Amino acid sequence: MEPKRVAEGKTKIVYEFDPEHYLLRFKDSITAGDGARKDELPGKGTLNAQTSALFFRLLEKNDIRTHYVGMYDEKTMIVTKLKMIPVEVVLRNIATGSIVKRLPIKEGEVFDPPIVEFFLKDDLRHDPLLNYSHLQYFNLLTRKEAEIVEEVIVKVNAVMKNFLKERGLVLYDLKLEFGKDKDNNLIVGDEITLDSMRVRDEKTNKILDKDLYRKGESLEVVKKAYEDFFNLISR
């Protein structure tokens, strides 16, 4: 008997597990353009679940709290129940994507220190940019909480940049989502996968993330990139 379904998004399904935990099952779906484009990529759910679990374990080893508890099966994680905040927190090390369209910034510019941005999770409005005042007005995060979130994502970035650099990879940017546990602590939730970061090969500048799909590459090319990436980080 399948557990009770709590919620379903574009790429994941949340199920009840026990009073303290959910099951987070990764689907084989891949999307772009706020869900405007969608395909099925067999095996992607397993790859993303395993990738996310690896990164969550890495963060936990570096004293960064996440919702990850363990694996239920190959594409399903057991996670701590959180009250998720509908905000995407994006950290950018190197300019690419939307920032070069919104601002007079050239592709490939290096941000030192990194730039942190907040976006409302709202597909219909294409995830609008938020500042501290917006976060407070919509009762999403207080100024203090926003600053804590910034500190956490900067620490996550440092850990992941170093981990990937050791494997010949460059972290251009990453997106995190946060939630609050029963004690009101801010915890890293959701996922950490190639759907939520941009990674390039250090020597060839080859794209290894969902930008391949955004740019119209075949599903075979996208899947191979995800597989190659997982093999690299699993060493």
From Swiss-Prot:
Q: In which pathway does it act?
A: Purine metabolism; IMP biosynthesis via de novo pathway; 5-amino-1-(5-phospho-D-ribosyl)imidazole-4-carboxamide from 5-amino-1-(5-phospho-D-ribosyl)imidazole-4-carboxylate: step 1/2
Any one Gene Ontology MF annotation carried by this entry is:
phosphoribosylaminoimidazolesuccinocarboxamide synthase activity
Q: What EC number(s) is this enzyme filed under?
A: 6.3.2.6
Alphabetically sorted, this entry's keywords are: ATP-binding, Ligase, Nucleotide-binding, Purine biosynthesis
Superkingdom of this entry's organism? Archaea
- Which reaction(s) does the protein catalyse, per the Swiss-Prot or TrEMBL entry? 5-amino-1-(5-phospho-D-ribosyl)imidazole-4-carboxylate + L-aspartate + ATP = (2S)-2-[5-amino-1-(5-phospho-beta-D-ribosyl)imidazole-4-carboxamido]succinate + ADP + phosphate + 2 H(+)
- Report if keyword Ligase is assigned: yes
Q: Does the keyword ATP-binding apply?
A: yes
Question: What top-level class of enzyme does the UniProt entry assign?
Answer: ligase
Query: Do you know which InterPro entries this protein is assigned to?
Result: SAICAR_synt/ADE2_N (IPR028923), SAICAR_synt_PurC (IPR033934), SAICAR_synth (IPR001636), SAICAR_synthetase (IPR050089), SAICAR_synthetase_CS (IPR018236)
> Record's CDD domains?
SAICAR_synt_PurC
The text of the family note is: Belongs to the SAICAR synthetase family.
PANTHER family for the chain: MULTIFUNCTIONAL PROTEIN ADE2, SI:DKEY-6E2.2
Q: Which HAMAP family match?
A: SAICAR_synth
> Which named protein is this?
Phosphoribosylaminoimidazole-succinocarboxamide synthase
